[in-house]
Structures are given as structure tokens and as C-alpha cells.
């Protein structure tokens, strides 16, 4: 099963629906990723708007 990125929050998942925002608007065309471990203390998480720990795509088509 391929991983898809949510077009709204950029969370990467293998499910048919984004577990973070609930969107079904997912794409298999995403580029670069960042793994967020500590959402509250991560400057990158704040910059990309990450709400939960996990893998996030930098660019999603």
C-alpha cells in the first residue's frame, strides 16, 4: 500500500482518509518529508502547522 499525503494538512498516511484532519483529498504525488516528534517544541512543526507527531510532506501536488 502506497503512502499518500493530505492536500490540506500534508500529513502522510497509508489510509483512505487523513487521520489528522479527516480529509479524503489525498495525493500520491508528494515530495520531501519531515518527521515531527515533539510538536510543542519544534520550530519546524510550528512553521508547517503540524498539530500531531508524524510524517509530513513538504510539497503535495
UniProtKB/Swiss-Prot annotation:
Top-rank taxon, per record: Archaea
Keywords noted in UniProt: Metal-binding, Transcription, Transcription regulation, Zinc
InterPro entries reported for this sequence: RPABC4/Spt4, Spt4/RpoE2_Znf, Spt4_arch, Spt4_dom_sf
Residues given in the record as Zn(2+) binding sites: 6, 9, 18, 21
SUPFAM superfamilies: RNA polymerase subunits
Ranges in coiled-coil conformation: none
Gene Ontology molecular function: zinc ion binding
GO BP annotations, alphabetical order: regulation of DNA-templated transcription
Comment field on protein domains: Contains a N-terminal zinc-binding domain and a C-terminal NGN-binding domain.
UniProt cross-references to HAMAP family, sorted A to Z: Spt4_arch
Family: Belongs to the archaeal Spt4 family.
Chain's role: Stimulates transcription elongation.
Subunit architecture: Heterodimer composed of Spt4 and Spt5.
Protein name: Transcription elongation factor Spt4
